[in-house]
A protein has these predicted regions:
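Active-site cradle of extracellular carbohydrate-active enzymes
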Residues: 146
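Acidic/histidine-rich, surface-exposed loop or edge segments in extracytoplasmic proteins
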Residues: 14-18
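A short, well-ordered alpha-helical element
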Residues: 1-7, 175
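Extracellular glycan-binding segments that recognize GlcNAc-based cell-wall polysaccharides
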Residues: 22
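PLD/PLD-like phosphodiesterase catalytic module centered on the HKD motif
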Residues: 3, 25-99, 103-139, 150-154, ...
C-alpha cells in the first residue's frame, strides 16, 4: 500500500513521519518507490522526529533511521521532539490526496501492532489543510508553532491538528462522547486527557450509552506509576480506575526497551454514534501538546466499520490490570 500510494504521485509528496525505520526487505520496497517518484520529477519533502536535549520522557520516543532518510532523494528536516513529539504519520500527494492514521513506517508497526490507515482521495480542501500544517512544521522546525490550521468541515470531513488545536480537539471528542446515544467505541494506547477521561467516567457511571474499548495495558500501568510519583495529576487516577474497570480490555505489550519488539496496541480511534475520530492522536494530555492530526468523519458506514474493528481488537485481550501481572 505504501509503495502504491507513492507510485501514484505525479508532482509532489510531503511526508510527516514520526518513525521511519525499516528492515532490508521493506526498505527496498519503499526506497524503490521513492526512487521512482524522483525519476518522474516528483518534488519530495520529509519532516521527522528527533531527540531534543531535554529530560527523556517515560517511555522514551522512537528514533527514526536518519541514515535511511538521508540516503533517499528527498529534502528532509529533523524536528526536535522532546518533550513535545512530531508524532504525525501522514503523506500529502499532489495537493489532492492524503494518507494518514496511526501507522508508523516501521516493520513492527506493520506486523506486530494494531493500527489504522486512512486514505482520503481527491479532496483538495482536506489536502490543503494538511499542506498548511506541513508548511508550518517545515518553516518553523518547531512542534509548538505548528497545528494552527482551522478545523473546517469539508464534505463530511474535518481535519484537526495539534498542538495548535490540541485542547479544542479533546473538548470536541469529549462533547461527542457525552452526546452519544447508541455507542462509543475507543482504541487508544492510553486515555489521560482530562476532558475525555472525565466524560467517559460519567457516561460509564450513567449507563446511558454502550461504551467499550481497548488500551495498551502496559502503557496504562506506566501512566499509573507516573501519577503515583507526580501528585499534581494524581487526581486523575480514580477516574482512570473507574473507566478501566468498565468494558475496556488491555494488551499486555512488551515494555519499551533497547532492542525489544514494539508490539503495542497502537490504534487511535473514537467512534461516537456515526462520527469517527481517527489519526495519530492518543487520548492523552501529551497528545494535545504533540504535533498530531485527526480526521473527524461523519459517515455511518465508516463508523460501523471502525466500531467493528475496535470490537475485534478488544475481544483479543483481557481486563486491564493496573498492577503489573503477577504482583500481589
Amino acid at each position: 500500500m505504501v509503495a502504491a500510494f507513492i507510485d501514484g504521485a505525479t508532482a509532489t509528496l510531503d511526508f510527516a513521519q514520526y518513525d521511519f525505520h525499516l528492515g532490508d526487505a521493506t526498505k527496498t520496497i519503499v526506497a524503490a518507490a521513492i526512487g521512482r517518484a524522483h525519476d518522474r520529477g516528483v518534488r519530495m519533502r520529509i519532516t521527522y522526529n528527533v531527540d531534543h536535549p531535554a529530560p527523556m520522557p517515560v517511555p522514551p520516543p522512537s528514533e527514526p533511521d536518519v541514515e535511511l532518510i538521508s540516503s533517499l532523494p528527498v529534502d528532509g528536516k529533523a524536528i526536535a521532539g522532546i518533550p513535545d513529539l512530531m508524532h504525525h504519520k501522514y503523506v500529502v500527494r499532489d495537493g489532492a490526496d492524503v494518507w494518514t492514521g496511526s501507522l508508523n513506517w516501521t516493520d513492527d508497526s506493520w506486523s506486530r501492532q494494531e493500527n489504522v490507515i486512512v486514505v482520503v482521495p481527491a479532496n483538495p480542501a482536506i489536502a490543503k489543510a494538511y499542506e498548511l500544517d506541513f508548511q508550518q512544521l517545515w518553516a518553523t522546525e518547531d512542534v509548538m508553532k505548528s497545528g494552527f490550521v482551522d478545523p473546517r468541515y469539508e464534505n463530511g470531513l474535518r481535519a484537526w491538528f495539534t498542538p495548535g488545536h490540541g485542547e479544542d480537539l479533546s473538548a470536541r471528542i469529549s462533547k461527542l462522547i457525552r452526546r452519544a446515544r447508541r455507542r462509543v467505541r475507543i482504541c487508544s494506547p492510553v486515555i489521560t486527557t482530562g476532558p475525555v477521561l472525565g466524560t467517559l467516567a460519567q457516561v460509564i457511571a450513567d449507563k446511558t450509552v454502550d461504551v467499550a474499548g481497548c488500551v495498551d495495558a502496559t502503557q496504562i500501568r506506566e501512566v499509573v506509576q507516573q501519577w503515583n510519583v507526580n501528585r499534581n495529576i494524581y487526581w486523575k487516577l480514580p477516574l482512570l480506575e473507574h473507566v478501566m474497570a468498565g468494558p475496556f480490555t488491555g494488551k499486555n505489550s512488551t515494555p519499551y526497551g533497547a532492542g525489544t519488539v514494539h508490539d503495542f496496541m497502537h490504534a487511535k480511534i473514537c467512534v461516537c454514534d456515526d462520527t469517527t475520530f481517527v489519526g495519530s492522536f492518543n487520548l492523552s494530555r501529551s497528545g494535545e501538546k504533540n504535533a498530531e492530526n485527526v480526521l473527524e468523519i461523519a459517515d455511518a458506514r465508516i463508523a460501523d466499520r471502525l466500531a467493528a474493528f475496535v470490537d475485534e481488537v478488544r475481544a483479543k485481550y483481557g481486563p486491564v490490570e493496573l498492577e503489573p501481572p503477577g504482583r500481589t
